[in-house]
């Protein structure tokens, strides 16, 4: 394409992982960066969430069978687990709370989670979702570079913006604050939002 330089690389969540790696691997290719709700290393919390996702898929009796939609219901369950971490108590309370005190089934939260599972099933295969979570678990910018992640962050000299979302449970602001402290030319910003990751 004849592109020699990228003015600004932008990535959120695992897209932020890619931007960080690119900044380290090709330091002269990118002038600036903006990374949102991301981290320099997959957290123990993130790995635990991904493990629950994979377990849901593995518990689907069709998983690893030689059929087109093997593990599909397990992946839907995995997505439902994910939505507990991508959102939070307050946002569920605001949007899925029941007004009918007599209701004992067909809850809004149930419907919402099932809808999200179905929606994901239209754009992801269970094997790709499973493998994606495995790859995310391996993210660590210090691997093969430094003993300490903060030393690897110091290698990134480009000007940058590191952004958090106040209610993010999956990749909380402490992750981005750590990066902003150790990235030499980074500014930090916090978005106050109830919508989580």
Where are these regions (language model features)?
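Well-ordered mid-protein domain cores that form the structural environment of catalytic cofactors
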Residues: 1-3
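Conserved hydrolase catalytic core segment
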Residues: 5-46
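Alpha/beta-hydrolase-fold enzymes
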Residues: 29-31, 35-119
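Residue-level signal for short, function-critical loop segments
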Residues: 39, 166-168
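Active-site nucleophile elbow and catalytic-triad environment of alpha/beta-hydrolase enzymes
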Residues: 115-116, 131-152
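Conserved alpha/beta-hydrolase "acid-adjacent" motif
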Residues: 144, 169-175
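Short beta-strand/loop motif that positions the catalytic acidic residue
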Residues: 156, 162-164
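Catalytic histidine neighborhood in serine/cysteine hydrolases
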Residues: 173-196
């Amino acid at each position: 394409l004849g592109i020699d330089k990228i003015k600004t690389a932008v990535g959120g969540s695992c897209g932020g992982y890619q931007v960080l790696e690119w900044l380290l691997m090709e330091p002269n290719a990118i002038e600036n960066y903006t990374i949102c709700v991301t981290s320099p290393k997959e957290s123990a919390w993130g790995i635990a969430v991904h493990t629950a996702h994979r377990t849901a898929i593995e518990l689907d009796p069709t998983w690893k069978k030689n059929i087109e939609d093997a593990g599909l219901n397990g992946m839907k369950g995995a997505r439902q687990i994910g939505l507990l971490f991508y959102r939070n108590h307050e946002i569920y309370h605001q949007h899925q709370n029941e007004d009918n005190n007599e209701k004992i089934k067909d809850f809004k939260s149930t419907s919402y989670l099932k809808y999200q599972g179905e929606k994901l099933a239209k754009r992801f295969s269970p094997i790709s979702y499973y493998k994606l979570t495995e790859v995310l678990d391996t993210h660590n910018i210090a691997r093969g570079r430094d003993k300490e992640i903060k030393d690897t962050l110091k290698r990134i000299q480009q000007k940058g913006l590191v952004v958090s979302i106040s209610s993010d449970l999956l990749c909380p602001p402490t992750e981005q604050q750590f990066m902003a402290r150790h990235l030499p030319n980074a500014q930090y910003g916090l978005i106050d939002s109830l919508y989580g990751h």
